[in-house]
Amino acid sequence: DYDLNSDEHFKPEIAKKTGKKVAIIGGGPSGLTAAYFLICAGHNVKIFEANQKAGGYLQYGIPQYRLPKEVLDKEIEQIINLGINIEYGVKVGRDISLAGLKKEGYDATLVAIGAQDAASMRVEGEDVEGVISGVEFLEKVAMNPKYDPGKKVIVVGGGNTAIDAARTSIRLGADTTILYRRSKQEMPAEHFEVVAADKEGVKIEILSAPVKITSEDGKLKVQCVKMEQGACDSSGRRSSVIIEGSKFDLEVDTIIGAIGQKVSQECIKCFDIEPNDWGMIKAQEETGQIGQSNLFACGECVTGPGIASRAMGLGKQAAISIIKYLNGEEVKAKEKQFIATMGDLEEIPEEFYTDIKHAKRYSLSELYAHKRVNNFLEVEQGYKYKEAKEEAELCLECGCLKADNCLLRDLITEYKADPERLKGETKTYYFDKSHKDIVFESNKCILCGRCVRYSNEVKNTDVITGVR
């Protein structure tokens, strides 16, 4: 926030221009992240975006009350201003093709089209007017915050998109009900999102599902059934079985289907790319390269729907692969980095934290439900200064003091130091608390000599000395 609102924004170092051109199809989280790292490497980057604004699902799928668009737009603007060229309103197959990009002299192409097509509800009559997907509904509201879904709305599904659609619908003044075929505990949405929807007045009808939709005189009639939980499937999840004679009808203005998302098969066909068994682009998972060509893919079109931070990470990964390709280097996955951990809290010897005081964690403050349900103001208000300070003080400061940028992990990875091969006994440590001002923790000592200088200069005592 400080950087966004300052006059001098952070600007990364941009390498000397290489003369190489990279086309990126899609300006969502993954595509924008890849563009950032490619422009920093000195390559010319052009993004082809289907919508009129960049940001992808962050722009059109995450509601304003969760992600204020003015913040998102500022961050995107900073990336674009690094020298990235972006063209809006471009549709794959209609305006651009792989062959066309090759003719224009692009040295590499990155496909980052996301997974924005809605999965079918598989309900009779779901194609009638008034039935809309969760993705399309959220996009319409993002473009027109005064969009009117009518007085009564049903949302079908139990994931985060269903919750977002329901919480958005209720902000537009609609009496909103979620229909979910399983129990509340089995809803795939984040628990805190379900709680928030409850607070805002969204009704949740569990063990209920639509089976038929008809339209009469501008109203939608939905025939629903009650479900009961059956046997567990191979994944351990209980199946849902229709209860005989449990049919009931609802009359609504809009039905929002939000049971999942998938990759556009039309786009995949236009690129002549082979999809995998789940309809996603078949690319090397760790590099994003498709075969041995100059074509790459990243983000949700490769992995399926997920969280934005994962898509951004894959965008960076793809950019690194493209940079290697353009430099004539072998495109291969980054070696798995060495990770060392002391384990979970219950696995750590008690002497490491017996003297540490337990302090409460602060939850982010929120607008009260009655103050937010009629508007799109940001719900989470962030920490107050005192809360932020006390949260920061929860850090145990257990890191290495030798250097800010520790190279030990990189060196262990480079030399392939295997903890199994170099296994030894677990080292135990002692604590010396005999002095009133100084506590010596041998597990933290890196022989830097700071304690000696501190005791001599500040405390004017030589209780600690350094011996070579």
Predicted features along the sequence, with ranges:
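Non-heme iron-sulfur electron-transfer modules
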Residues: D1-I14, E124-V135, E274, G279-M280, ...
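Glycine-rich dinucleotide-binding loop and its adjacent helix/turn
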Residues: D1-K16, K74-R94, A118-L172, N276-T287, ...
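Iron-sulfur cluster-binding cysteine motifs and their immediate structural context
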Residues: D1-Y2, K53, I84-I86, E393-D418, ...
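Ferredoxin-like iron-sulfur electron-transfer modules
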Residues: D7-I25, S30, Q59-Y60, V90-I96, ...
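N-terminal Rossmann-like FAD-binding beta1-loop-alpha1 element of flavoenzymes
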Residues: K20-K46, T161-I170
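Rossmann-like dinucleotide-binding cores of NAD(P)H-dependent redox enzymes
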Residues: I47, N51-L82, I86, E139-V141, ...
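FAD-site-proximal beta/loop scaffold in flavoenzymes
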Residues: D127-K151, S234-P305, E347-E350
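A conserved FAD-binding loop/helix module that cradles the flavin
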Residues: A165, C298-E329
